[in-house]
């Protein structure tokens, strides 16, 4: 199994995502009119508050791992020598936030040699927390509160399908062209579904 120190670090990162979600919900639960172009719009405030919390707390865990985020992009010349880095999206699903359908997430990944080795997705409004570890599977938990154990997570069953049947989960209103090109190049058949499908029944169990 996972060592105690490793478990502690996973818990720390999961709690960072939960706390970032709390910051977003503080703003989400207020009544607001969104002016997308305004720098101090609620969406911008939620994004920045989440971003700042995640960065500060990740640095406390491991100050030597660089952080790449939409809020502070780093040029490729600098990034290409990174062996390991955090990739964060402090508020994924801005349209979902604006539409008030709750289908927005906090995303934190640890990338090593350009491949994700650990990732967290938290949908605070849906109280759904997912994490995955390379070679150890993916897990989910319903929670709005901070956690102190991994034992309550439910393992997500992964299908051993061929790549032709792999389902790709992405946010329908947050898809981008690069992602779509990558999917089409690597998978002959795919379904791009709204992240919300993760959050109904056990749809996540059907996804690879």
PLM region spans:
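N-terminal subdomain of lithium-sensitive/metallo-dependent phosphomonoesterases centered on the IMPase/IPPase/PAP
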Residues: 4-91, 112, 146-149, 173-191
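Residue-level signal for inorganic ion chemistry
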Residues: 24, 47, 58, 94, ...
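Generic detector of well-ordered alpha-helical packing
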Residues: 48, 71, 90-93, 97, ...
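A short acidic, often aromatic-flanked loop/helix-cap motif at beta-alpha or helix-coil junctions
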Residues: 75-77, 198-201
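Glycine-rich active-site/cofactor-binding loop and its immediate structural neighborhood
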Residues: 87-111, 118
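Acidic beta-strand-loop-alpha-helix segment within the catalytic core
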Residues: 108-198
């Amino acid at each position: 199994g996972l060592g105690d120190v490793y478990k502690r670090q996973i818990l720390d990162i999961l709690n960072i995502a939960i706390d970032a979600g709390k910051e977003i919900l503080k703003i989400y639960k207020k009544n607001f009119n969104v002016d997308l172009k305004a720098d101090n719009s609620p969406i911008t405030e939620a994004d920045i508050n989440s971003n700042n919390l995640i960065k500060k707390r990740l640095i406390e865990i491991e100050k030597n791992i660089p952080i790449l985020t939409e809020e502070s992009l780093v040029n490729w010349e600098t990034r290409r020598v990174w062996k390991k880095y955090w990739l964060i999206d402090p508020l994924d699903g801005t349209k979902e936030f604006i539409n008030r359908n709750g289908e927005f997430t906090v995303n934190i990944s640890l990338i090593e040699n350009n491949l994700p080795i650990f990732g967290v997705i938290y949908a605070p409004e849906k109280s759904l927390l997912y994490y995955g570890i390379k070679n150890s599977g993916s897990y989910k938990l319903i929670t709005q509160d901070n956690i102190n154990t991994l034992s309550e997570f439910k393992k997500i069953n992964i299908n051993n399908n061929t790549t032709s049947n792999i389902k790709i989960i992405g946010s329908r209103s947050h898809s981008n062209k690069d992602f779509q090109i990558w999917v089409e190049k690597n998978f002959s058949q795919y379904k791009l579904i709204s992240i919300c499908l993760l959050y109904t029944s056990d749809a996540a169990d059907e996804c690879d």
